Design a protein with these regions (language model features):
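Sec-exported extracytoplasmic/periplasmic mature domains
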Residues: 59, 69, 129, 140-143, ...
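A short, solvent-exposed beta-edge/loop patch
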Residues: 157-220
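Solvent-exposed, polar/charged alpha-helical surfaces in well-ordered, non-transmembrane soluble domains
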Residues: 52, 56, 62, 133-136, ...
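A small/polar (G/S/T-enriched), proline-flanked helix-loop surface module common
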Residues: 68-180
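Second-shell loop/turn segments in exported
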Residues: 48-50, 119-126, 203-205
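C-terminal motif of bacterial Sec signal peptides marking the signal peptidase cleavage site
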Residues: 17-21
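N-terminal export and membrane-targeting signals
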Residues: 1-13
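N-terminal "mature-domain start" segment
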Residues: 23-105
């Protein structure tokens, strides 16, 4: 199966192995514990937001604090990857090879953080019913295989997936952790997905950073 950045998490993992990517955490890293449950605002009127308004609601480096900087938008395509051992992921090769592309209203920003870490925030907007059904299918498919191999022209990585609990923010929440092992290094990447009304937030990065910044991102994304 040949896919190009077939899933947001896999794109993040590929970036982590690039020379300009983030340094891997220590080998004994583990998913951070979920923070205390704190209510967050939801989009009560379920208004679908255009991409321009979503872009205004993305986090900035100032929102994240010292040591963070926004990365320039990518000018080249992600490396093509083959997935071995998980035929279910083939379904995520549709919609421009991005499973979230079914939601045309979207915004994205990538940050580098202290120590060379990477944090990615994405916002999407669609009717709540469409967001709920679409993301449910995506996360079910991405979690269908507990392990598989990710092969690029320069890297062969063993990937293990784990569904994890996330704070009860917004209307619906999903969480997944990927443990990627290649070249003697192990990298752990978490993706937290939160739907609040007609807005969908996707935050990917190290478990600790995702746990710390997801609530701030949701508050800004759903602010009136």
């Amino acid at each position: 199966m040949r896919l190009r950045h077939f899933a947001i998490l896999t794109t993040t993992c590929l970036t982590l192995w690039a020379p300009t990517g983030c340094s891997a955490p220590p080998s004994d890293s583990a998913p951070a514990e979920a923070q205390a449950e704190i209510p967050a605002p939801t989009a009560g009127d379920h208004e679908v937001l255009p991409s321009e308004r979503l872009a205004e609601r993305l986090l900035t480096a100032n929102d994240l604090g010292p040591g963070y900087a926004a990365r320039p938008a990518a000018t080249t395509a992600s490396p093509e990857a083959s997935v071995e051992g998980c035929p279910q992921l083939e379904h995520l090769g549709n919609a421009a090879d991005n499973p979230y592309a079914m939601f045309p209203n979207q915004g994205k920003r990538v940050f580098t953080g202290p120590g060379g870490t990477q944090l990615t925030e994405e916002l999407y907007s669609a009717p709540p019913k469409d967001l709920s059904a679409g993301v449910g299918r995506i996360m079910t498919t991405m979690g269908a295989c507990p392990s598989y191999r990710l092969v690029t022209p320069t890297t062969v990585a063993e990937v293990r997936t784990q569904t994890v609990p996330v704070p009860r923010l917004g209307d619906e929440q999903w969480g997944q952790v990927l443990t990627v092992t290649a070249g003697g290094r192990r990298t752990i990447v978490q993706q937290t997905v939160i739907r609040a009304g007609a807005v969908l937030l996707v935050v990917s990065g190290s478990p600790a950073e995702v746990t710390v910044h997801a609530q701030t991102a949701l508050a800004k994304a759903t602010a009136r």
